[in-house]
Regions:
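Glycine-rich anion-binding loops of enzyme active sites
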Residues: 64-66, 70-72, 99-181
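N-terminal glycine-rich phosphate/pyrophosphate-binding loops that anchor nucleotide-derived ligands
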Residues: 5, 10-96, 140, 163, ...
Length: 181
């Protein structure tokens, strides 16, 4: 699967770029920063949270799955950050054997002047759009804000449509799942 091979290359670049920094630790505050499932399950009603799956089925629409993912900056390049965040969000949809059909961006940039914010916004969108285009989708909107974090925080709310499994595509789906695992 092209998207996952691309994501692995991106992470290899991150590791290579940071391997000479003795105190380097990945601190993306993405998946590693999630509130644990038991806390969520205890606090939220069973109607809100029923599973720990990466993407959930949308009620009354058996073929539609939705997910949301966010990460803070693990690289200084906004373009590359956009690509990483898009791949991160898409992987949840692929994990439930679905094709991406919609993406909304959630982005917080650090307080800065308009010129820097415009430049960073353009770069994040450009990187993410490149990845979403490969997945057959585009960013259709979202929400932006500025905040006190010194680094950008980016996320996507994504929707996918479940792929049907038949004799013709069973081998292809099996190969895609092997590449993911």
């Amino acid at each position: 699967n092209y998207i996952f091979r691309n994501l692995l290359k991106i992470f290899d670049v991150i590791i290579q770029d940071n391997k000479n920094i003795p105190s380097y630790q990945m601190q993306c505050r993405g998946c590693a920063a999630k509130v644990d499932f038991n806390s969520l399950k205890t606090t939220l009603s069973k109607e809100i949270i029923t599973t720990s799956e990466d993407a959930i089925n949308i009620n009354n629409y058996p073929k539609l799955y939705q997910s949301v993912d966010m990460i803070s900056s693990i690289v200084s390049d906004p373009y590359l950050l956009g690509k990483i965040a898009a791949n991160h969000a898409i992987s949840d949809i692929i994990a439930v054997n679905s094709k991406l059909i919609s993406a909304l961006m959630i982005l917080q940039l650090p307080y800065s002047n308009s010129k820097i914010n415009s430049r960073d916004l353009e770069q994040v969108i450009s990187g993410a759009s490149e990845v979403f285009k490969l997945a057959g989708c585009s960013i259709s909107g979202g929400h932006t804000m500025v905040g006190k974090d010194k680094d950008p925080v980016i996320g996507f709310s994504v929707i996918g449509e479940k792929k049907s499994v038949n004799k013709k595509n069973l081998n292809q789906i099996s190969l895609e799942l092997k590449e993911v695992s």
